[in-house]
Amino acid sequence: MSNEKMDTSPPSYDSHFTLETSMHRQLKDKRIILASGSPRRKQLFEQMGFPNVETCVSGFPEDLNKSMYITPWEYAADTSVQKAIAVYEKLAAEEDSPDIVVSADTILILDSEIMEKPNDPKHHLAMLKKLRNSKTPHKVFTAVSVIVPMEVPIHPGYVMKTHLEETQVKFDPSITDEFLEAYVRCGEGSDKAGGYAIQGHGALLIESIIGDFSNVVGLPIRATFKLMEEALEQGDADNYD
């Protein structure tokens, strides 16, 4: 009988914390397009393990008539879809066309009202006070859309998947006006829907959060990862039908 002991030790760690799943292998050396100019969304996309992601601003005017939609999140979903289509159509004619296009649109809602980006410091302060004084959480919705081109000539020539993620956020009601004024002056939230950046100093405004933190930043990474998997799987299946 051999005296050699079976090696039951766990596998060693990969260097540089590289995440490699079947989808990472599938998209290695592929052209991945994020239809956004947001550095925050690009950072979140890279966090999913795709450092090779390219960004491309859609140019879609994002001026859909909100009154035409029954719910605000339908407006976000339609905007996300149009962003993805605009970028796909812009790049599809290139010699190195994209292998996958991902877009997103985030809105913040309080009591059925869409909270846009602040117009000026006065509007900004009023917006933050409204969020602080609310007895109920506000909701952050991000619609994510994924396009995967198809090789077979079937209209419209691509697979489209869309997902809507909801996160509830509650401001700390004890925050003082002086603190809100200081936050407005720092300028961090001046270009953010709702007037705050939860990934920065804006985290000091938050009492509680229910749902995906990354959704509030602008891209729900777990939901986006799963949506990409689904779109790629359907694209592969349709190509071989």
UniProtKB/Swiss-Prot annotation:
Q: Does the keyword Glycosyltransferase apply?
A: no
Task: Spell out the protein name for this chain.
Answer: dTTP/UTP pyrophosphatase
What is the annotated role of this protein in its UniProt record? Answer: Nucleoside triphosphate pyrophosphatase that hydrolyzes dTTP and UTP. May have a dual role in cell division arrest and in preventing the incorporation of modified nucleotides into cellular nucleic acids.
Q: Which organism is it from?
A: Schizosaccharomyces pombe (strain 972 / ATCC 24843) (Fission yeast)
Q: What is its EC number?
A: 3.6.1.9
The principal location of this protein is cytoplasm
Q: Report the InterPro entries cross-referenced here.
A: ITPase-like_fam, Maf-like
Q: Which UniProt keywords apply?
A: Cytoplasm, Hydrolase, Nucleotide metabolism, Nucleus, Phosphoprotein
Q: Which Pfam families match?
A: Maf
What lineage does UniProt assign to this protein's organism?
A: Eukaryota, Fungi, Dikarya, Ascomycota, Taphrinomycotina
